[in-house]
């Protein structure tokens, strides 16, 4: 199935029994939001993953519900605006020149949505680079996880010097619920930032519900 909308192509692909929805130039289309189904198998721990068709797509993810988010949860109308700033980001330095992937919607981009996976790809014609990001829920393990794989390909015949900075700008420690983040932001930050922990060998928290791993 193929459909033309706003000069961008959408199609449904069947390959070896796997159904995938492919959208070209997804950043130029009307906004939409959805969730990965969180399939983790009978022995796994499901993770919910909330994504939109902007930037690197993933806005928030966590376990159980939005009170157990690892990346802060935003409603759709806010997520469309924030995903490029608070979601996953990838910075490259090629031969001394800096660039950020998936930051320009005018670039050639493609989104591929599977049953339990999401992939995006961008071709940077001027820099002769292509970047692909794959997301999927880790199945069959005792720990729940959203797996993210970033692949950068040099499309030029020449060797290049390439440096990569990639990741998410902030994460929420265990025990910090959505209401605390939204309505007690500065207080929550103070609870998240124990100081002189290594010197004192101890940290004081307001209640047993605020548990976090300190490494």
For the regions a protein language model found, what residue spans apply to each?
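Anionic coordination/interaction segments
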Residues: 1-215
């Amino acid at each position: 199935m193929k459909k033309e909308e706003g000069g961008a192509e959408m199609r449904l692909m069947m390959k070896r029994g796997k159904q995938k929805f492919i959208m070209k130039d997804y950043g130029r289309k009307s906004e939409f939001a959805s969730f990965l189904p969180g399939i983790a198998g009978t022995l796994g721990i499901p993770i919910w993953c909330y994504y939109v068709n902007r930037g690197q797509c993933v806005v928030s993810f966590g376990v159980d519900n939005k009170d157990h988010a690892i990346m802060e949860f935003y409603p759709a109308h806010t997520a469309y605006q924030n995903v490029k700033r608070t979601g996953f980001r990838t910075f490259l330095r090629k031969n001394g020149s800096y660039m950020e992937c998936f930051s320009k919607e005018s670039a050639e981009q493609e989104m591929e949505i599977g049953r339990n996976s999401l992939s995006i790809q961008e071709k940077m014609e001027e820099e002769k680079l292509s970047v692909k990001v794959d997301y999927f829920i880790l199945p069959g393990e005792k720990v729940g996880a959203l797996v993210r794989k970033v692949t950068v390909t040099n499309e030029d015949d020449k060797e290049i010097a390439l440096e990569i900075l990639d990741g998410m700008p902030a994460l929420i420690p265990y025990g910090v619920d959505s209401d605390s983040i939204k309505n007690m932001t500065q207080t929550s930050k103070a609870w998240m930032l124990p100081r002189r922990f290594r010197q004192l060998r101890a940290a004081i928290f307001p209640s047993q519900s605020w548990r976090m791993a300190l490494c």
